[in-house]
Amino acid sequence: MAISINKLDENIQNQIIEAYQNNMSLREIENHFGATRNTVSKFLENKGLKTTKGNHHRLYFHDFDFFETIDTEEKAYWLGFMYADGYIVNNENHYGEDEFGLTLAEDSIDSIEKFKASIKATNPIRYDDSKSVGQRLVKLVCRSQKTVNDLIDKGVLKGKSLILKPPTKVSQPLIHHFIRGFFDGDGSLMRYQNKNCKHISFGIDFTTTYEMAKWLQETLNMGSIFPEKRREATWYYSVGGNQQVLQLCHYMYDDASIWMDRKYNRYKELLEKYGENQGT
């Protein structure tokens, strides 16, 4: 016979809460404590803990603690990427843990694949044929209240595009990896060539909030910031001149082991053409 959790002593109730927070599934809790999954789910929801929906078992897994502490290149990079292009889905109106994900154009699928590998996700990569950016979209969406809470704690918020603020929980030795991830999500490395001459120039732009643009300018000690007149609360951080662009790329890439292939290849083009003491 199934037991009533509310009739259990407080110590057992706390053990159930702790078991769920340590990623024990509702099915495992049911077997261990003798309460039905539905009863456990309602108990946890009443305690403010979101639970998985449907039949109350987890279909896919990932490293739920990946963003708990930002202490490696990989974590700093992906936090920066999530700042730029990540999102959170809040399931506040029904049972179900919140979700987080990345959606990119298909020509950047390598980044989705790398993210999936970094967080050890078993979730499938899905395709969206809407072609809103001229090509198919690819996405990875994962569910975990623990991971979502850690992302929120690190500054990744729902609807963050207008309110994003500089990171406060990334140590100085890892900041350049964070910036590289942010660049891969919201930055552009552009190539310009005058029709009347052979000179090629490069520029870097980040599209973000005023607070983030100002932080980038102060952190990197170069570049300029200016507003996007057509989009509310949107600012650009811009770096021009081949040598300054090269300097910023060196800062982001010199000891890197993870990046978006498309932008890294553009950096290699810049490096091959202008190297250390060439260009303007």
Language-model-detected regions and their locations in the chain:
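Internal intein/HINT superfamily modules and their associated LAGLIDADG
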Residues: 1-280
